[in-house]
Each structure stands twice: as C-alpha cells, then as structure tokens.
Amino acid sequence: MVEKEEVSGGGGGISEEEAAQYDRQIRLWGLEAQKRLRASRVLIVGMKGLGAEIAKNLILAGVKGLTMLDHEQVSPEDLGAQFLIRTGSVGQNRAEASLERAQNLNPMVDVKVDTEDIEKKPESFFTEFDAVCLTCCSKDVIIKVDQICHRNSIKFFTGDVFGYHGYTFANLGEHEFVEEKTKVTKVSQGVEDGPDAKRAKLDSSETTMVKKKVLFCPVKEALAVDWSGEKAQAALKRTAPDYFLLQVLLKFRTDKGRDPTSDSYSEDAELLLQIRNDVFDSLGVSPDLLPDDFVRYCFSEMAPVCAVVGGILAQEIVKALSQRDPPHNNFFFFDGMKGSGIVECLGPQ
C-alpha cells in the first residue's frame, strides 16, 4: 500500500481515498505518474464505439477531468459498439446519452459533455485541455486541430475504426519521458562462477529510471509522405498497407461527409475502389498495394476492434500525460483480419 504521508501531504499529493481507488495502477506506474494523471484534463471528440472505449479507459485510469464532445445524434447503428449509450437513446445527442454511464465508472473524475460542432470551436477552447483526442473527424479538421494543439503545447491524438481496421496517431511535439531500465552489473570472476563471470549481467532486482526525449511530426506531414524518392521507394515495401487504406477512407469521409455504411454497400464499395485509384495515383504508388477485396472489411465499427484500438489509444494518452514509458511514434495500425498491430513512424524523410 502507498504510504499515508506520501498521498495525503502537501505538494500536489492525492487523497487516501484516491490512493485506495488507484492502488493497483500506482503500483504499476508509480505515484508521480498517477499525480500527473490526476492533474490532467482530456477532450474526446466523437462518441461512437471508439470514443466510448477511450473514455472508459481514461475515466478508470483517473484523469482529473474528461470532456466528451459530439454534435451528432445516436443512430441504431451506434448501439452495436457504443456501450455507454442505453438502447432507448436513439435520436438523443451521443455525448449526452453517454454521460450517465461514463460518470458512474468513476465518480472521482469530472466528466462533462459538449454538444457543439468541433468545427465551431475557437482556438482558446482547446487550451483548457492537456490532451485532445479526435475520432470521427474529417482530414481537414484533424489537421487544423493538430496545428492548434502544436502551437499551444497540447498533446494531440486521433484515431478511427473502419470495420476490421483501426488506427491511432500521436503528435506530442518534443516529448520527454522516463523509462525503467534493468541495471547492468559487472560481476567479478569467482571460483564458483567460471570465466563467464566477467561478462556484464542483467540484475533484474535493480532498475534505474532513464530520461529520454522524442520528436514528433505534425499529422499533415505524416499524411503527405513523398514516395517518389529512392529512400521512400525502399521504405514503401516495408510500410503497412493500412496507411494507404487510411488515406482512402479519409478521402471517402471528406467527399461523402460520412464513413462507408452497409446500408449502401454496393455504391460505397464502388466509390472506395475509385477513390483508391485516385489517391494512389496522387501519391505515385501502385493500386496493387491495396487489393480490391479491401472494400469487404472496412464497413461500420466493430466492437472488438474498437476495444483493441481504444485500449491502445487510451494507453498512449496515459503514457503521454504521465510522462512514463516510450510512446508510439507516430502511427499504430490494427488489422482485425490478421489479429495484429504495427507501429509505423511516417513523415518527412
């Protein structure tokens, strides 16, 4: 158990009640990391299935405050993956319909709702938060909010789920963090140890905290990689196809003002193929990187994929706010068909 004087004293400590509530995670990532979380306010934009997963994880982690922003109404399709919304809430605002269950997860967190369109928010609105996470947003909005966050030293995240596929992206600017490392000890040669005793050994019982720094690029640059260069062509073979799938789906969202839906499967599938060809042509890459059957696996939000991607995204937000452990720099892609995920660092060469 955390010592009483550590948690209830001055200097930004946490209460005994909070220490009991968060005892397990304090053991996991330490008291200082938990203090940073308890001082952080987070904005989540888009309360569909992925937004619900992120909100749930951050509320349970114990941030100071969380604001759920969404100007859209609950649709019957939302009920398939959005567990914070009650069945009879169709037609209500998505954020408002999520509030009761979200707050009940952890009364110690100040959970708020905002029903205004994100595009109408002034820059000053975002400065109220330590981290901003966008879902269900257009490419233009993602780029605009990322730029606002960068100017104001706010940690920026975005992510989405499209059928079996999902992604996350982070721009933390110049981010400092600490990482726990096992100490390397030099063991002197002894009679019982033999000649190998001179080699350096890892002593798992002793660890040290190492400070590190990493630099992130804006999402605009990450989505505008020039694939024409020699180095880029070599990297192209190692790049996850999901990066290019994301480009196609963001273009679809921009053109149609929505994501592909099963209600108009044939029409949307045909349009996705056309957008794939147009996007790949503009990027200067072959459409063969994304075979035609991709259209079968990117419709609607799937609850299991939301759970995985939402868990990863919330974990990255916690790591960034607590300044503990290396963050994903900068994309994470999840392929539900393969049951695997990959971290990709994409941006200026």
Curated annotation (Swiss-Prot):
Highest taxon above the source species: Eukaryota
Pathway the protein contributes to: Protein modification; protein sumoylation
Phosphoserine modification, residue list: 15
Residues bearing the modification N-acetylvaline: 2
Modified residues (N-acetylmethionine): 1
Places the protein is found: Nucleus
Modified residues (N6-acetyllysine): 201
Similarity field: Belongs to the ubiquitin-activating E1 family.
PANTHER family listed in its UniProt record: SUMO-ACTIVATING ENZYME SUBUNIT 1 (PTHR10953:SF162), UBIQUITIN-ACTIVATING ENZYME E1 (PTHR10953)
Protein name: SUMO-activating enzyme subunit 1
Annotated source species: Rattus norvegicus
